[in-house]
């Protein structure tokens, strides 16, 4: 197996400015310096001409780089912002809908160097970085294989089921059909060579080159999130109804392995109220700074957290985020939970409408201006003199979907002396680590 190439959708705008910092070849001629493309009649306008697509390939791949202006990072998250970003590899422009898409084409190992630097602090321990390199590589190649399967399947792939009383939707990277993955947290956080790559990041990539997590002869769909909250979630509760043997419930601990049945409401509430021992139950800034870049460190409470909304705030928020007018909110009723206590289905009861929503990310998006930390929460209502509650407090556990590697837990394991293979096999139960190229 040779090192694969990857295509990454970086930005989507009607007009894109970019700088070719050295010579790039396009349509047989060499260009450099400040350039601009814009949408014109469904095509790409550049230098007074229109094109269906454009590809800029580096004249000297070892030193060539390009810069994209005003790239949005953290799309729909609480720290969303724009920044200029620097990239190696080739640059491709295509038209999708009413926007131009900028795509970066490069080798998997070069891509991983950026992902590790973007997702993690470059000051993270070597073992944590090596574990993340194997996970990111595995996830990427598994998604490419999955996309090929979906493309070749006669069955239509759907990420949503909807009826009058229920909306169940999950979010995955399959809505990218013209490139492999996007550059934001929706897939893996990728910011080219904008973030500094230290020698330790390069070592982590090099020492694990070509290594993949495998299970039953296939590359593992190696998911990860910031904090599981103490128990791993299972794949089918967050995405399509498919079980993977390596993504199953387990305590994020070696000393305490007892797991209450968190699909039972009473048990889930008690679990969230507690703060049990787990690898990811830490407030150690040295450890947290390994996983959380500066903008992630704006989030302080993640293992256990709470959010309070007034009736007006919650009803307006749900209307804004879902597009559905429920009227005043009377109740938020848990219908189904996964193995970590995360809500899979939630009933929103309003004076105008009642509906069940899911899965976990749909719930998180509906109940927050960006993304609620997780769907592992219970609700406390504050009643007034009227029929509808005057306030709702959501008390929750963890940060993210909780499936696969828990980044903060893995950082703690690295600090405790576990090597990268031990870290990986703690979070991906029964998997193996194979060198494939």
Model-based region annotation:
Residues 1-437:
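Conserved, single-site charged/polar hotspot
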């Amino acid at each position: 197996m040779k090192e694969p190439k990857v295509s990454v959708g970086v930005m989507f705008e009607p007009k894109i400015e970019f700088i070719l910092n050295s010579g790039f070849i396009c349509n047989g001629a060499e260009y450099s310096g400040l350039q601009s493309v814009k949408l014109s009649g469904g095509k790409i306008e550049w230098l007074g001409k229109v094109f269906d697509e454009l590809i800029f390939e580096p004249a000297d791949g070892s030193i060539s780089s390009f810069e994209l202006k005003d790239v949005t990072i953290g799309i729909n998250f609480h720290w969303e912002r724009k920044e200029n970003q620097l990239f190696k590899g080739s640059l491709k422009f295509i038209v999708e809908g009413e926007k131009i898409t900028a795509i970066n084409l490069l080798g998997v190992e070069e891509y991983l160097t950026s992902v590790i630097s973007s997702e993690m602090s470059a000051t993270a321990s070597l073992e944590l970085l090596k574990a993340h390199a194997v996970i990111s590589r595995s996830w990427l190649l598994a998604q490419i294989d999955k996309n090929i399967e979906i493309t070749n399947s006669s069955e239509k792939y759907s990420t949503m089921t909807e009826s009058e009383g229920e909306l169940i939707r999950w979010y995955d990277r399959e809505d990218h059909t013209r490139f492999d993955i996007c550059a934001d947290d929706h897939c893996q956080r990728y910011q080219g060579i904008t973030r500094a790559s230290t020698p330790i990041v390069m070592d982590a990539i090099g020492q694990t080159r070509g290594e993949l997590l495998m299970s039953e002869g296939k590359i593992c769909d190696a998911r990860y999130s910031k904090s599981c909250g103490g128990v791993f979630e299972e794949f089918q509760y967050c995405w399509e109804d498919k079980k993977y043997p390596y993504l199953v419930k387990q305590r994020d601990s070696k000393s305490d392995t007892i797991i209450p049945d968190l699909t039972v409401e009473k048990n889930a509430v008690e679990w969230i109220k507690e703060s049990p021992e787990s690898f990811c139950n830490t407030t150690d800034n040295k450890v947290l700074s390994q996983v959380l870049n500066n903008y992630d460190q704006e989030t302080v409470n993640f293992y256990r957290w709470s959010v309070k909304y007034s009736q007006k705030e919650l009803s307006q928020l749900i209307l804004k985020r879902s597009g559905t007018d429920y009227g005043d909110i009377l109740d938020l009723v848990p219908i189904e939970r996964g193995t970590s206590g995360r809500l899979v289905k939630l009933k929103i009861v309003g004076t105008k409408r009642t509906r069940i929503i899911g899965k976990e990310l749909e719930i998180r998006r509906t109940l927050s201006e960006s993304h609620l930390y997780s769907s592992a929460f219970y609700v406390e209502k504050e009643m007034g003199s009227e029929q509808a509650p005057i306030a709702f407090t959501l008390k929750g556990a963890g940060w993210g979907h909780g499936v696969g590697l828990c980044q903060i837990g893995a950082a703690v394991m690295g600090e405790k002396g576990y090597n990268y293979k031990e870290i990986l096999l703690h979070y991906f139960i029964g998997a193996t680590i194979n060198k494939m190229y």
